[in-house]
Amino acid sequence: MKPKHFDIIHCIDDNYGPQCGVTITSICMNHSDVDITFHIMYANLSKQLIEKLRNQVAIFNKSIFFYKIDVSVLENSPLEGGKTLPLATYYRLLVAQYVSPEVHRALYLDVDMIVCRRLDAFYQTDMTNWAAAGVYDISTLDHGPSERLGYNFSLGYINAGVMLINLDYWRQYNI
């Protein structure tokens, strides 16, 4: 059974605006029969980019919401946001604080991808008692990141750019 609605999260800055537009278009073209709400998390976006994305989503008769992130929450975190990765990389960690409590699950997707198939099966993954579902990151042949973090690589390593988030769980456990 196909889901009737998807909530999709993207975290961007002005540098990734054009890529976000391409990702949104690819999602919409593969899901014309699904009601989709896009949730865009950002710290700084130009008014022109916001308007472009609004217009693009409207072409496909989908919805879009924008959430301006208070980056001060991340700047002093142990993640050292912005030093090795763009600060926007970490916005997904705040999704449960920004998106409406009426949204129970959301699919986070990086914007440097083109969706070529339907996402129904992944979106419907049973999330009972799980914070998130991800896909194995097959590009992690270099075990450096897991060793640096003290993580047992044999447990698997997910690609954080494709993640189904159980927002109810995140809110319950204050993630």
Where are these regions (language model features)?
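Glycosyltransferase catalytic domains, chiefly GT-A lineage
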Residues: 1-175
